[in-house]
Amino acid sequence: MMERMSPETRRQIREKLVELRENQIGEALRQIIEFDKTPVALKAHMDRFVIGQEKGKKIISVAIAYHYRRLGNALKHSMVENGEELDVALRNTTTPKANILVVGPTGCGKTYTGEVASRLVGVPFAVEDLTKFSEVGYVGQNVSDILLDLLIAAGGNAHVAQMGIVYLDEVDKIATESVVYKDVSGRGVQKGLLKLVEGAENTIDLGKERISLSTRHVLFIAGGVYEDLEGIVKRRMARD
């Protein structure tokens, strides 16, 4: 028979969990505030793990260096120089972010490049296959699951999750032509994604607990094959 846990033991466990969570926030903040990698240094690190894709690695390196140096400098100013709490600092950091669109064939290393970059920065990384998503209220995953996956990748820490990276795979598959029926896996998903990608305050419902999570500082990398992209461009140019 399992022995019941004493109130003192429960208290010690709660204190330890709080300590671990605070340490996790502190480490993530330290890495972002001290982040000083240049795009050249980031790409050199990626070269050790990702073969080829020179143009893609350069674009991702520039975007990530800009994003986290911007965020790090803003948090340093708010927290270190002005003495603001993390919640206030994240809300007050309003400089615009630039998300990334990566185009390339399946298996060329788009997702892995983003994962390598997230490890170098020291932030959580979540991958989402958009072909499995549908509009809220229908069978399948919906965009709120993206926030939950990011929260899980951050060890349940909402503050750390707000500074993470999300890779949106197969983004080209949710493109839709004009249709007369309700498109729950195309246009419906697009509308939900737009809110997240632009940066918004969101609520994750965990049953007995509700967690607020902003995507204002989450870096989104959208990847797709876009097989007929060249043909689409040619047809549009021909019309013009």
Language-model segment annotations:
Residues M1-D240:
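Non-catalytic accessory segments flanking P-loop/AAA+ NTPase cores
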